[in-house]
Design a protein with these regions (language model features):
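Solvent-exposed beta-strand/loop surfaces of large extracellular or lumenal domains
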Residues: 411-426
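Hydrophobic faces of well-ordered beta-strands that scaffold small-molecule active sites
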Residues: 49-51, 120, 149-151, 228, ...
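Loop/helix patches that line or flank the sugar-binding groove of alpha-linked glycan CAZymes
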Residues: 224-408
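Short loop/turn motifs at secondary-structure junctions
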Residues: 115-116, 384, 430
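Substrate-binding/active-site clefts of carbohydrate-active enzymes
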Residues: 1-115, 125-128, 133-144, 148
Length: 443
């Protein structure tokens, strides 16, 4: 998207065996029909297509682009005529320029009309000026009143509230850092029994509620504006963050056996499950990254024919790698099948019971947990159902929660998750370190 704003990349539609460097690709136009067929196939399964778009900077490698047409008009420059690069990608587009704004809007409308895309996720959304954002909303809704807009609410600033006021969803990096942490070496979050930055139990409760502005440190007007996530294309995968965070793998370790590295230890599996349970039971929109459900690991292959001082190590910034570092190895789903099955159960739970998506703020009630600052418990009600959700993120002590005996059935524990009963809850729930549970009231 940073080169051709109106065309799908032919590379992903070509037979890679016929790929030749320094030769034109996509001359048959096959990629256009392939993309349209893909959208049709998703729509047939009632799956919306949200496309990642980049309108804040331009590719550094394309010939005949806007740099050659009119650098001063299309780009933000400093007083010496150099590119401003708050995107950290070499240049920032001047989205406020009328013809740049028109290009962006025309591109959005084209993807909606020609390819029937249902929505867009904007890279570094804060680098796009508000007038352009509002024009996009106005014009796109003429085509589809239900068009979806999501963004990274940073880049040249940080303003999730500004996007929420305009009806956009935004990636919630606060829940990401608060729950997981920011750095696997010395910036651990709640699942590790730590407070990252200015996080505390009240912020954790706010994340459960959808990080709403009615809470002291909230960001969003509506819970559906909070895109809750713990892993994306940037940074370590959640699985690798936990591998390094436990100290079982070093950041600069050379991985000689990738399959062995992928296999989760008991401690790593508990942390992955606790993180997933919090993510899927929090109000807002749940986002997971490809392979997160089986703790995918990004290991740079040793046998690549390019110079890389980090060969054999876990990668934390793999944007530039078209090799096994970024390929999804589904054999690893079998290696960590218990985690995969846990994710499947949590997805089923969230889809079946709307309480985990639509519970009103007033119907989520927290219970104080004495003597364990990393334990959390709350009840939620919606549409005739009532649930108890309990967590113990402490690393070394149990958490005890009294409940009414014979009134609750267990749907999630530290091993299984889903909608089938795992048994009747006793009068006291005892959670071992790094675990959680979900109970449903028996009608």
């Amino acid at each position: 998207m940073t080169a051709a704003f109106f065309a799908p990349a032919a590379y992903y539609s070509e037979d890679w065996k016929l790929f030749q460097r320094n030769e034109w690709m996509g001359t048959t136009g096959k990629q256009v029909n392939d993309f349209k067929d893909m959208v049709k196939a998703f729509h047939k399964e009632n799956i919306a297509v949200i496309m990642d778009v980049v309108y804040n900077h331009l590719s550094e490698y394309e010939i005949g682009n806007l740099k050659q047409i009119d650098k001063e008009y299309y780009f933000r420059l400093d007083e010496k005529g150099n590119f401003i690069a708050q995107s950290y990608c070499g240049n920032d587009l001047k989205t406020e320029a009328p013809m740049m704004r028109r290009l962006i809007i025309d591109s959005i409308l084209y993807w909606m009309k020609e390819y029937h895309v249902d929505g867009f996720r904007f890279d570094l959304g804060k680098l796009i000026d508000w007038e352009t954002i509002e024009s996009i909303i106005r014009e796109a809704k003429k085509i589809n009143p239900n068009v979806v807009f999501v963004c990274e609410p940073w880049g040249g600033g940080y303003d999730p509230q500004g996007f929420s006021l305009r009806g956009w969803g935004a990636w919630n990096d606060q829940i990401r850092n608060g729950i997981k942490g920011e750095n696997p070496n010395d910036g651990h979050g709640w699942i590790f029994g730590k407070w990252y930055g200015n996080n505390n139990i009240d912020r954790i409760k706010s994340y459960v509620n959808g990080t709403l502005i009615k809470d002291k440190h909230g960001l969003f007007q509506k819970k559906e504006h909070s895109i809750n996530y713990l892993e994306s294309h940037d940074g370590y995968t959640l699985g690798d963050f936990i591998r390094i965070g436990t100290g079982e793998v070093k950041r600069d370790s050379i991985i000689n056996d990738v399959d062995k590295n992928v296999k989760l230890s008991a401690q790593q599996e508990k942390l992955n499950k606790l993180a997933a349970l919090f993510l899927f039971t929090s109000q807002g929109i749940t986002m997971i990254h490809s392979g997160q459900e089986f703790a995918r690991s990004k290991v740079i292959p040793k046998n690549i024919d390019v110079a890389d001082p980090h060969k054999g190590m876990i990668d934390h910034n793999s944007y530039d790698k078209d090799n096994e570092t970024n390929y999804i190895n589904y054999n690893h789903a079998e290696i960590n099948y218990d985690l995969l099955d846990y994710y499947k159960g949590l997805i089923e739970l969230r889809k079946t019971y709307e309480a985990f998506r639509k519970a009103e703020y007033e119907n989520i009630n927290f219970t104080e947990v004495p003597d364990n600052k990393f334990a959390l418990a709350y009840s939620l009600k919606y549409n005739g159902y009532e649930f108890l959700v309990m967590f113990n993120a402490c690393q070394n002590i149990e958490a005890k929660f009294p409940v009414a005996e014979n009134h609750w059935e267990i749907l999630v524990d530290n091993k299984k998750a889903g909608t089938k009963s795992l048994g009747i809850a006793p009068a006291e729930i005892i959670l071992s370190p790094i675990s959680g549970t979900v109970l449903k009231r028996i009608k």
